[in-house]
Amino acid sequence: MNELILKGERAKEASYVLMNATTSEKNDALIKMGQKLLENKDYIIAENEKDLENAMLKGTSKAMLDRLSLDEKRLEDMADGLNQLVNLNDPIGEVITMWKRPNGLQIGKQRVPMGVIGIIYEARPNVTCDAAGLCLKAGNAVILRGGSEAINSNKAIVKALCEGIKESGLPEYSLQLIENTSREIANEMMRLNEYIDVLIPRGGAGLIQAVVKNATVPVIETGVGNCHVYVDEEADFKMAEDIIINAKTSRPAVCNAEEKLLVNEKIAEEFLPKIISALREKNVEVRGDSNVMKIADDVKEATDEDWGKEYLDFIIGIKIVNNIDEAIKHINRYGSGHSEAIITNNYQNSQKFLQRVDAAAVYVNASTRFTDGCEFGFGAEIGISTQKLHARGPMGLNELTTTKYIIYGNGQIR
């Protein structure tokens, strides 16, 4: 039997058990998963070092190496994330609403698991742990297909997590990893409709578009970034500088990092030299339009391709705009619908930006880096959805459920 189909069958069987697992059973599994992760930390870090060595040989960027890297602190954070899930409300079984019809029928809408979730992702081994924990708490089985860059790390993490699941008494096939990282296997997984109920890609634009174009399994499209910060003519310069530096440099290889800076022309000559100097102190390469190049020296000319590009690196594109309307128009044309921010002390401009920018998260006077399940109070997230169907924004436990109708009668016929 095809190995992928076997994993699908096992996941489907596990999903029927998880569907009816109690909150205490799922929480016990999460606690044990966290314990096993820490018990195996030396082994996991050793396997991660193999991935890092391979990545360095391939000339992987510093920012991408940071995404791939695991140490004791990050493993402790991953285990802590599993424990935080224990404290979150279990969405399964919640009756969202209920009403009574004139014929006496009582109709309720109840949260239930999706079933089997497939996740295709790239070089972030922490996703392995986050996805496993979230899916299990929401009563779903999960099949993971990580990138080749993190294969040793992922195998070690899944081995530890599965030990915890098995020890708790829940099905050991609640979590499975596809160890074959070939594109052919990924394409086959995208068409496994009989077993996978929904597919969630996490990674760069190339991966996400490949899944969207090739999958026959329903897809929830997640977060290519290209986030913008617009500095309005009535912005506080110190606040703007702090937000821009944080949004660009704290973790440049994540999807909620700032990639583009738009500056109102009325403040450009005063503000741009300051912010460009601050960015260069953080080793950020600055690319700008022709107007930016007139104000600042040693700026690389931005091309049309730059405006729609997610750099995931210490690079920023800067454009001078005439007013807030041009900023909004530019964002809605080139943005990915992820996270966008305005820095302003003008209330009317802040409201215009909130209402007219088409994105999952829109900020006034705050960093785009807050678009995150934990920061929003959801606990960990499975990804940031940039589409509008089913889920939008950080996807926590509720977004990993669907609904069914439950109807109580006393003999009604139609």
From Swiss-Prot:
Pathway note: Amino-acid biosynthesis; L-proline biosynthesis; L-glutamate 5-semialdehyde from L-glutamate: step 2/2
UniProt cross-references to NCBIfam families, sorted A to Z: PRK00197.1, proA
Keywords: Amino-acid biosynthesis, Cytoplasm, NADP, Oxidoreductase, Proline biosynthesis
Enzyme Commission designation: 1.2.1.41
Species in which this protein is naturally found: Clostridium botulinum (strain Alaska E43 / Type E3)
Location of the protein in the cell: Cytoplasm
UniProt enzyme class: oxidoreductase
UniProt protein name: Gamma-glutamyl phosphate reductase
Lineage: superkingdom: Bacteria
A Pfam family recorded for this sequence: Aldedh
Family: Belongs to the gamma-glutamyl phosphate reductase family.
GO molecular function: glutamate-5-semialdehyde dehydrogenase activity; NADP binding
HAMAP family in the record: ProA
UniProt xrefs under InterPro entries: Ald_DH/histidinol_DH, Ald_DH_C, Ald_DH_N, Aldehyde_DH_dom, G-glutamylP_reductase_CS, Glu-5-SA_DH, GPR_dom
Entry-linked SUPFAM superfamilies: ALDH-like (SSF53720)
GO cellular component: cytoplasm
Catalysis performed (reactions): L-glutamate 5-semialdehyde + phosphate + NADP(+) = L-glutamyl 5-phosphate + NADPH + H(+)
Chain's role: Catalyzes the NADPH-dependent reduction of L-glutamate 5-phosphate into L-glutamate 5-semialdehyde and phosphate. The product spontaneously undergoes cyclization to form 1-pyrroline-5-carboxylate.
Location (main, coarse): cytoplasm
Presence of keyword Oxidoreductase: yes
GO biological process, one term: L-proline biosynthetic process
Keyword Iron-sulfur among record annotations: no
